[in-house]
Amino acid sequence: MCGIVGYIGKKEAAPILVEGLSKLEYRGYDSAGVAIIEDQVIRTRKCKGRLVNLEEKLNEESMIGDIGIGHTRWATHGEPSDKNSHPHNNEKGTISVVHNGIIENYIELREWLTSEGYKFVSETDTEVLPHLIDYYYKGDLLEAVMTAISKVEGSYAIGVVCSEEPDKVVAVRKDSPLIVGLGEEEYFIASDIPAVLNHTRDIYLLKDNEFVLMTKDGVKLFDKEGKEIKREIYHVTWNADAAEKGGYDHFMLKEIHEQPKVIKDTMTSRIMLGKDIKLDNIEISKEQMEKINKIYIVACGTAYHAGLVGKYTIEKLARIPVEVDIASEFRYKNPIIDKDTLMIVISQSGETADTLAALREAKKKGARVIAVTNVVGSSISREADDILYTWAGPEIAVASTKAYETQLVAMYILALYFAQEKGTLNKEELEELKEEMLSIPDKAEKCLETDEIMKKLASKTHMKKDMFFLGRGLDYAVALEGSLKLKEISYIHSEAYAAGELKHGPIALIEEGTIVITLATQEELFDKTVSNIKEVTTRGAKAIGIAFEGQKNMDKAVEEAIYIPKTKSIFAPLLSVIPLQLYSYYVSLEKGCDVDKPRNLAKSVTVE
């Protein structure tokens, strides 16, 4: 969740580091800092809070140097504070380290280093690293880092500089993302590609346990045995301005409005009328499909909600039993998996720590794994057997919108593909579903026209302390996502329930004026859902309903009805979520919250 940037070249390092860190703000952070080598001395500036605080500090106490490392920290060990911010230095101030991840054996290492005379000034796990590297340093920084890392247990992406070797940056990764940027006589390390895109499009994608040595002459990669590695350069084709706001007030609003396009992009070349579905990076034969007796879908947060839609859709169309698990729970329950199990992992970043751990657990037990991810070359995409990329483009706002939509599209593509390969749908049925799916981008565009309605609704309801979301079947999965969006960015306590469960407890929470938002797009369940709405309105709730155009009965059941274009009920989640995203956005705006960077949250959760 932290962001790392490192630089060596001919330019001033400080502004490049700060600019790079600003491109990683979406990852979430509570403090920031840089270390620059100036006249063979490491100068460190760091502080709690936003990057603007660090920039003010740098303006007051400028640093001149063409080599350095920078960091935005998300607290895991030790509170957010200046002393706990990175970079961390050894006592002599000759070695400086930035780190993303968790050192699991830091207590043992700290006790041992303390017994060796080292003094600690922070509460972080990271501070063991500069002391450990110092302990093993004998004039060769790369060798010292390699030896120190061999003593470390946990996950890490690390950048190191040393004033005694002022022409080097050393880095290493394990279970935490790190890339190398290859510029014109300048080189970079970073947690993610956007940090270097203003300077280069050529990068190395590092694998676990690989070390980097950057000098002004170039970059060398090594394995943990010290053997040099050759790596193909990956050329980034998307533009840096893809991560800009494009005239919208916030990234989140921009990304909501990009959804019709990214839905279409994710379907392109995969869903075509009159042609079989062919997926470039999935190589499951018909024979292998026949042997699959169970599917696990594993994900976290919003991606988990996409997985719930995937379960319903795959079971309905392909008739394969599907279980959906939260990744952080899955890996500890000793799941029943074998070679005839298929696992689908969903992660926008492709670096979600719990999802990656679940993937590895499944592979250990012999399962085949399909990754659904938005990031080419991410850890999850490299370790899975098959990949279905979601073409959402960079998503900057912490609260996911367009990435969620493309994850839903991926679930529908897989469901149709499995049905095609297993023969559970005939050609006419497949063509009918594909034709309807291809109409979704235009219908999603129409859903954006609810903007003004949701804005007015937000202005009337943003002061409420509690809200509830209801739905049945696929509507329940969307209710969960709508509730999560609201609590993520507006900090309003919100819960989602299967509408039929109301009478089993949740109805006790309904009182005069309670806001209840109900989705009613599943036609076979519409009447039952309306009955549930009546149960809450008779107890004083203010009901808001989302239904298809033409469902005029909704007007009579709720105080405010929002209508979306009609589609087949199975595809409703792609449309019904859009008004809920807009509502959450405008409630957050009314409350004066930080829409793109909500408190306590990070975009990419790369620690367990």
Swiss-Prot record:
The keyword NADP does not apply. One of its GO terms (cellular component) is cytosol. It catalyses: D-fructose 6-phosphate + L-glutamine = D-glucosamine 6-phosphate + L-glutamate. Pfam families: GATase_6, SIS. One of its GO terms (molecular function) is glutamine-fructose-6-phosphate transaminase (isomerizing) activity. InterPro entries: GATase_2_dom, GFAT, GFAT_N, GlmS/AgaS_SIS, GlmS/FrlB_SIS, Ntn_hydrolases_N, SIS_dom, SIS_dom_sf. Keywords: Aminotransferase, Cytoplasm, Glutamine amidotransferase, Repeat, Transferase. The active site is at C2 (nucleophile), K603 (for fru-6p isomerization activity). It is found in: Cytoplasm. Its EC number is 2.6.1.16. The keyword ATP-binding does not apply. Residues 2-217 form the Glutamine amidotransferase type-2 domain. PROSITE patterns: GATASE_TYPE_2, SIS. Homodimer. Catalyzes the first step in hexosamine metabolism, converting fructose-6P into glucosamine-6P using glutamine as a nitrogen source. NCBIfam families: glmS, PRK00331.1. This is Glutamine--fructose-6-phosphate aminotransferase [isomerizing]. The lineage of its organism: Bacteria, Bacillati, Bacillota, Clostridia, Eubacteriales.
